[in-house]
Amino acid sequence: VTVNAKTSASAGNTWRDLPAAQQPEYPDPEALRAVVAELESYPPLVFAGECDQLRARMAAVAKGEAFLLQGGDCAEAFDAVSADHIRNKLKTLLQMGAVLTYAASVPVVKVGRIAGQYSKPRSKGTETRDGVTLPTYRGDSVNGFDFNEKARIPDPERLKRMYNASASTLNLVRAFTTGGYADLRQVHAWNQDFVKSSPSGQRYEQLAREIDNALNFMRACGTDPEEFKTVEFYSSHEALLLDYESALTRVDSRTGQLYDVSGHMVWIGERTRQLDHAHIEFASKIRNPIGIKLGPTTTAEEALQYIERLDPDREPGRLTFIVRMGADKVRDKLPELVEKVTASGATVAWVTDPMHGNTFEAASGHKTRRFDDVLDEVKGFFEVHKALGTHPGGIHVELTGDDVTECVGGGDEIFVDDLHQRYETACDPRLNRSQSLDLAFLVAEMYRDQ
């Protein structure tokens, strides 16, 4: 149970005195204040107890007893809050989860990049086309994608739309994951379809057959555990817009501590992780599990300072380092971070984000990623942990459940010339359903080789 936001206003707002990167410039501060006041009265989207449960699951990841699968859109869009989109995304994550659980013989913690991922940090504040300069698109929670002045003006009313879109998404996710749709046998049947129709299916056929035998064996023994019928699924997003996140921060009536009830887990991005800035300050005040994206410029000293600021009690499950180095850098840059952090005695979860360091512009002008680069970064991540005797804790991917053509390569090979066919992302290129499942089978093989 959570109590009214008003009691927490001062404790959760210490970030306001510090510089905050990547915040929209709203033309009417009064309108923003009115929206924030309204959001403060809204009910929580998630409960503190669920955040605690995820923290316990992440503790298992940090200790090497579980694996994190975190995935979803680069940026969600308001017009994609449909049952089909959400179901397909969930279906893809559940299929990946089933493969990883079986092949790695390890519990898989399933966290969606979903129900709140409506904002994007950008490298430039403006965009120029044909001599016209407008504010850059920062995600549906801030402004419109269309390139015209009216659409691009940041509008605080969109924060309420983000709340409502997140609420309806979460409602569907909760219904799907507890209402029989996530039944393991159903998920396995979808995987069998994939193996039959995928060009790289032969590789995975043996694994699918093993899972089939295991399920048949259990059925023959008369075992039909309740756990097969539902799935634990958590929501996460980047905590970027601090006005929104702090408006949805509440005091937990059980403990008197602050929780950001906009999602179970939030992370701080590569562009907003300055130690003396507002985002880290905000994250230090809430009890949710926290992720931090670490790019190739991160030093071991910085990593240790994040632990000091965000996990002073050294609590496994509290802090996750999501590493996004690029396939060409991960083997050089990651070892020192892992060594120094491990030597400090902190137990953090190490997760690879093989997407963000591997983006390039195709000749066609599309932003894309090579499936082989994504795979190579995951391989490098596993190699580093194997060499150091530490635990590769999980994978953070941008994916969709639809058959889009945004990343090149994969079993159903997509070529640069195919990108225009279904390039639908609002921001960065995502793995499609088939590429995501390819990745799950390949990661499962890597995990087995550990």
Regions found by a protein language model. Name each.
Residues K120-K124, D193-K196, D332-L334, F360-S364, ...:
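Short acidic, glycine/serine/threonine-rich loops at helix termini
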